[in-house]
A protein has these predicted regions:
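Conserved short alpha-helical segments that host acidic/polar catalytic motifs at enzyme active sites
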Residues: 1-154, 159-219
């Protein structure tokens, strides 16, 4: 990373949930279109992918992967053609999505993060010196020497550019529905998620389980 040039970057470690575990489905996805280039990294699952994909196919889209992430990227690119800004295109696309997701989208001059309205999937913001970082977990910030600032709120979109950070909460509904599987399985023990330490959550969950379903165990 130190040898790379530029002031914006995007990366992804894929946990296969949609599409086969093949190189073609690796992220980030990079698109070249009439407005330039666009890169997208996505964590989550959509429940209306077939409808969104069919809409694109009817307009001539040709897909190179079997992921719902490519469907999202195509919609952002398509909306960008008819929008004044990338942020506007992202918001238009996000309003079409049904499911849980955390997105990081990179244009030549901006890094945009958006979290689904219910906060099913996590996304957080960190800072190292004069550099801002978006990640699914706080432990990812630690690994690059960044300090955790805060969680991105459900329905919030964050834009990072040379002008600093801007927040947009147009997608927020005021309702939260965090995925319990993040706390018991997906997240790393040393992560902090929506104000909760993952390690503590698992300890408390285990105690609650033992009270609800006590068993005679030889430990």
């Amino acid at each position: 990373i130190r040898n790379m040039e530029g002031d914006l970057g995007i990366g992804h470690v894929r946990y296969s949930t949609t599409g086969a575990s093949v190189a073609e489905n690796a992220q980030p996805l990079v698109l070249s279109y009439i407005k330039g280039t666009l890169a997208l990294a996505h964590n989550g699952n959509l429940i209306n992918t077939p409808e969104l994909k069919w809409e694109l196919i009817q307009n001539g889209a040709i897909f190179h992967t079997t992921t719902d992430s490519e469907v999202i990227a195509f919609h952002v690119a398509r909306e960008r053609v008819h929008s004044k800004t990338v942020e506007e295109a992202v918001l238009k696309t996000a309003r079409k999505l049904k499911g849980g997701y955390a997105l990081v989208i990179m244009s030549p001059r901006k890094l945009i993060g958006v979290r689904d309205p219910l906060g099913l999937k996590p996304l957080c913001l960190g800072k190292r010196d004069n550099t801002y970082v978006l990640a699914s977990e706080s432990c990812a910030l630690t690994s690059v020497g960044a300090e955790f600032i805060r969680d991105i709120e459900p329905g919030e979109m964050i834009t990072i550019s040379r002008n600093g950070i801007e927040s947009n909460k147009e997608l927020s509904t005021g309702k939260h529905a965090h995925c319990v599987f993040e706390y018991i399985y997906f997240a790393r023990l040393d992560s902090m998620m929506d104000g909760v330490k993952i390690y503590d959550a698992r300890i408390r969950g285990g105690k609650s389980l033992a009270k609800s379903y006590p068993v005679e165990a030889d430990l």
